[in-house]
């Protein structure tokens, strides 16, 4: 069998644009006359796809599939909306979203072509899920923490699949993560299989809109199944050869947790893009750096080999984690590379 030719980024983008145009054309064929719509109601966005969204009515709790009014482009899970129900359904569509209420927060993900793309709204807590398989990456944890701190969303670190570890191995993981507890982050050690830490996780999620983020294969969907047993979300299988997740949730979706609180399961991402941030924003997002900011000899200190850098001195004195400090510089370097690649992509796009 001939091997399928891999699509270029430009071809992938054109296919995606054509799909969106078809969805928009389908939505445009459903025209709601004012006489066909009821009174305005409040609702919560459960999930959004193309020109449609599933809206939970604030009064009845029923989920209705709705079209979006023209001009509503940014609509994501967690958004609070004003919508109107049709007197009868049309082609499976129950109503129309009229407006989006102001957000308290919005989690965005950078896109090389389209800039910042919203992922979820009105988030109270970012649950950063890691696992012992795929291999734990502190660099990726730090990227998510930067995102949480920059957006003003409280982070919660969760290490999943601890049932795969012997007691001595678990102690090693606790040692690796001790630096995060030292600077004030809460860490939970959990396992769906053994049930360890699930009750504590439930308690941390109550009375909040939470978003689960993390690499593919870390078990976000398996934790959703543990928290909401009546759901049967397809779980990512782990390849024995690569150790990477073969399946990942394709769209962000909000779920109600029986024990209290709401949960948004987001698409898995390999790493969290931060190229849209300035280096100064990355620096401020490191909690342990904050007491030292403004104390370096030079105002434009890069906190590397600069003379009189008190952050580097704090690292040498054991006051700041060397691992976190090294990750900081790797992230700053990768930001510069990604910004250059993005500019190249924009120039290439302009030539198409």
UniProtKB/Swiss-Prot annotation:
Name the family the entry cites: Belongs to the TRAFAC class YlqF/YawG GTPase family. RsgA subfamily.
Q: What is its EC number?
A: 3.6.1.-
Which of this chain's residues are annotated to bind Zn(2+)?
296, 301, 303, 309
Q: Where is the CP-type G domain positioned along the sequence?
A: 104-272
The source organism is Vibrio vulnificus (strain YJ016)
Q: How does it assemble?
A: Monomer. Associates with 30S ribosomal subunit, binds 16S rRNA.
Q: Where is this region: Disordered?
A: 1-24
Instruction: Write down the NCBIfam families for this protein, in alphabetical order.
Output: PRK12288.1 (NF008931), ribosome small subunit-dependent GTPase A (TIGR00157)
A GO cellular component term found in this entry reads:
cytoplasm
Q: What SUPFAM superfamilies does the entry give?
A: P-loop containing nucleoside triphosphate hydrolases
Name the coenzymes or cofactors required: Zn(2+)
Q: Which GO molecular function annotation, any one, does this entry have?
A: GTPase activity
Q: Which Gene3D superfamilies match?
A: Nucleic acid-binding proteins (2.40.50.140), P-loop containing nucleotide triphosphate hydrolases (3.40.50.300), Probable gtpase engc, domain 3 (1.10.40.50)
Q: How is the cofactor bound?
A: Binds 1 zinc ion per subunit.
Q: What does this protein do?
A: One of several proteins that assist in the late maturation steps of the functional core of the 30S ribosomal subunit. Helps release RbfA from mature subunits. May play a role in the assembly of ribosomal proteins into the subunit. Circularly permuted GTPase that catalyzes slow GTP hydrolysis, GTPase activity is stimulated by the 30S ribosomal subunit.
Which EC class is the enzyme in? Answer: hydrolase
Q: Name one GO biological process term.
A: ribosomal small subunit biogenesis
Binding-site residues, GTP: 160-163, 214-222
Q: What is this protein called?
A: Small ribosomal subunit biogenesis GTPase RsgA 1
PANTHER family the record matches? SMALL RIBOSOMAL SUBUNIT BIOGENESIS GTPASE RSGA (PTHR32120), SMALL RIBOSOMAL SUBUNIT BIOGENESIS GTPASE RSGA 1, MITOCHONDRIAL-RELATED (PTHR32120:SF11)
InterPro entries for this protein: G_CP_dom (IPR030378), NA-bd_OB-fold (IPR012340), P-loop_NTPase (IPR027417), Ribosome_biogen_GTPase_RsgA (IPR004881), RsgA_GTPase_dom (IPR010914)
Q: Pfam families, alphabetically?
A: RsgA_GTPase
Q: Which UniProt keywords apply?
A: Cytoplasm, GTP-binding, Hydrolase, Metal-binding, Nucleotide-binding, Ribosome biogenesis, RNA-binding, rRNA-binding, Zinc
Keyword match Acetylation = no
Q: What is its main location?
A: cytoplasm
List localization entries: Cytoplasm
